[in-house]
Structure formats: structure tokens, C-alpha cells
Amino acid sequence: MNSCHPPQDEMAGLIGIYAFQGFYGLLSVVVYTFNIRALRHHKNNLDKSFSLLYTCCAALSLTYFLDHFLIRRFVKLGFFCEIILENFGEPNYWMMPYKTIASYCPIAILVFHALIAAHRFSIVAAPMRGVQLWDRYRRLFVLVGFLIPLIFMWFMIPCKSYAELDSEGSGGLDIEYKKVFSISSSLAAAIAAVLFGVLTLCLTFGMLIALAKLSLRKLSQAEISLIVFEVFMTVFTLIYAFTQGILYYSIYIVKDMELKSTVIQFRTFAIDIFILPQAWTLLFLSTTVRRYTLRAFGKRLGVEFLSTEIEKSARMVSVAPATISLQKSTVLNYNFTLQNLF
């Protein structure tokens, strides 16, 4: 449909979906912010490697959601359509930051999910070496994590971008870019999604296999929570990777426009499933993060959720040395400094 605005009979439903996505998305942004602050506040007592990886991943997720929600989903509704077309209908560099962020962030998030899975696998499979490796090279791993996505989208950086009517959807605008190099961004994104999705899955399975060799009855609630966190992260990553793979398959292999339309409708939810739940899983599973968040909300609402005695007790636990049983367990000795984080 070559129209600035979606059909009137669809507009109310689209606005409802947009508002719903905005509500849970912005709420997740707030939770992510508190999670990051909690990890920074307790950085002396928590696993610095995980805290750094999670913080980077959260920052990328926040950037990608705000970029995707405030621009792409906004223009799909046709708001200010004529003004945008008049000013940005021709290729220009003003709109290219959106395309660059929209291409870079999801790949970077995939990479950091794989790094978190690698961190967990190395700590479980080889605790002492894993601890030494991540303590020594965590900043290098993070730097590499930010550079790897450029391999899959560098060719988009010098391109110009422009707004055009969405001729394949239900109206509204789309933002495209003018190619400088004859490289398919869809293919690169699909390869990255499948590659790092499978890598995250393999590392998670490796972690579970290593854990299976231990006495599962000796696992603490903290470690079980940590396993649940990674399993959820892997599932969300695979949902996004599968969606990206099917999208490329529908467009370039079978050229099934009906399948493409169905996948695109689901893709916005797949993106949210991919980038937002890590805020909630850490909040629900981590006692430290949850305690900090409740205390922060309590100060703003004038309510004391936790007494001073509980805070003192928690602080004593967080700095207490490892117990004998903890020292004997090669897994419990380091995972997120489990007794502190969970």
C-alpha cells in the first residue's frame, strides 16, 4: 500500500500495540537502569566480569529498543509522514545514525550473549583457569565484543539513508539506505544471528553437561538461579536468531511474500523478547539487585521496604569469606560470587 497512513480500520489496533509495547518496553528500561546501578553499587562484592558483560549488554539493549521503538515503529504509524518525506525523502546522512544503530546493536547483543555464555561455561568447566582468564582479560573481551559486530555491518557506515513510503506493508513509512557496496545487510544479519545463536546454545549445553558431572543435590539455590538465568537468555537468543533466519529465507530463498509479511509482524515482538527479558530475569533471580531496586523505589515513594538490620545483615553476608563447603565446590566458589549476587 503506497500511503502515508495505515488504513483507518487498522489504526486503532496499531496504536494499541504500539502503546502496549511502549509500556512494557519503557518499564524494562527502568528495570535495566536499576540493575546497572545495583551492579555498580555492589561492584566490590560481585563478579566483576559478569557485571561488566551484563552492563554492556544492557546498555546495548536500551539503545536498540529506544532507537527501534522511537523511530521505526513510530514512522510505521505514519505520524508526521509528509514532513519526514519532504525533508528526508532523498538520501542523506542525517538519518544514517538510526540505520547504523539498528544494524549494529542486535549483532552486538548477540555477541555479548555469547560472551556471557562463554564466561559461565569457562567458570564451570575450569574454575581456576576461568577465573584467572576473565580477571585478566575481561576488558579485552569486552573490546572485542564491541568490534566483532563491525565485521557484519561495516559496509553500512558510509551509506546515506532516506525515508520512503512502505509499499509492502500496511502503509506508513520505512527507512532505507542507499548501498555503497553490493553486500546484503539481511544476509549478514542472518549469518550473525544464526552463528552467535548456535554458539550461545552450544556453550549453554556445555555448561549443563559440566554441571551434570557434579552432584546436582549439592547445588545451592544461588547456582540454580544462575543456571535459570542463562537458560532463559539462550532461549530468547534462539527466538531472535530463528526469526532472522526465517526472514532471510522467506525473502531471498523461497521469495514467499506472505511468509515474509507474517515474519515481519512477529519480528517486532521477537526483538523485544530478545532484548528486554534479561532485565526482569536478573531482577527476579538476584537477591542483591532486587534488594537494591526495592530500596531505591522505597526512597522515592517514602516507604522503607527493608529495615536497617536487614541491610546490615545483607552487607555482612556480602563481604563474608567463603565457607569450607564453598571452597570445596569448584562451581560455587566463583559463579557471579553467587552468595553475593543471588
Swiss-Prot record:
InterPro entries per the UniProt record, alphabetical: 7TM_GPCR_serpentine_rcpt_Srg, Nematode_SR-like
Compartments reported by the entry: Membrane
Cellular component annotations (GO), alphabetically ordered: membrane
Transmembrane intervals: 11-31, 51-71, 106-126, 140-160, 191-211, 222-242, 269-289
Keywords, comma-separated and alphabetical: Membrane, Transmembrane, Transmembrane helix
Pfam families assigned: Srg
Domain of life: Eukaryota
GO annotation (BP), single: sensory perception of chemical stimulus
One GO MF term: transmembrane signaling receptor activity
Main location: membrane
Membrane topology: Multi-pass membrane protein
PANTHER family: SERPENTINE RECEPTOR CLASS GAMMA-69, SERPENTINE RECEPTOR CLASS GAMMA-RELATED
Family: Belongs to the nematode receptor-like protein srg family.
Protein's recorded name: Serpentine receptor class gamma-69
The species this protein was found in: Caenorhabditis elegans
Name of the gene: srg-69
